[in-house]
Amino acid sequence: MKRIIKNPDSVIVTEGLSYPKDKVRIRELLEKEQQYICAYWEDRITASSSIDVEHFNPLLKETSQDSYDNWFAVCHRANLMKGTKNADSRWEQHQLLIDPTHTDLEQRICYDKESGDYFGIDTAAQNLVDYLNLNDHELREDRIDYEVVINDYIRENGIEWTTNFLKRNRSQVRFRRILEIIFDIQL
């Protein structure tokens, strides 16, 4: 999972946008800030994608404490699988957990190249993996298939060409963190 870095000078903050009043604008700005990548599943956001403004802590949604730091652009399916504040108490079941902006998120959530699974190195990190359903069967298969495609690019064109291609086409790249881990490249 790739860490999301929030911008303290985001237009969302500087213009004082609020949810739900400015929901569409917030979603568009979050998509751009996240380079058109789902904050949870690292899947590409396209014009045809169904995207939600996700409230990481669902208990804050539409309260006075809800703010930019709690909002992420996520694929609708990822949001559905996570559940809501009323859906089977998933939020309460997975406390203690780290959030997607945590400074050492990428060191605490690891990727197993063999199985295609994410795992946390501690309880809080594993709770995030479980809470976000990062090891959903279909998602895991997508990651493995994407790795094969990128491996083919590397075999045909070399690592340097492929890395430069991925950097130039950053908004088209899925599963960035996994590619960084597997191929030892920085995207």
Go through each PLM region and give its residues:
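Cys/His-clustered metal-coordination modules, chiefly Zn-binding fingers
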Residues: 32-39
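Coil-to-beta-strand transition motifs
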Residues: 36, 48-49
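Extended charged
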Residues: 1-15, 20-29, 44-47, 62-72, ...
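Short N-terminal amphipathic alpha-helices
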Residues: 41, 49-54
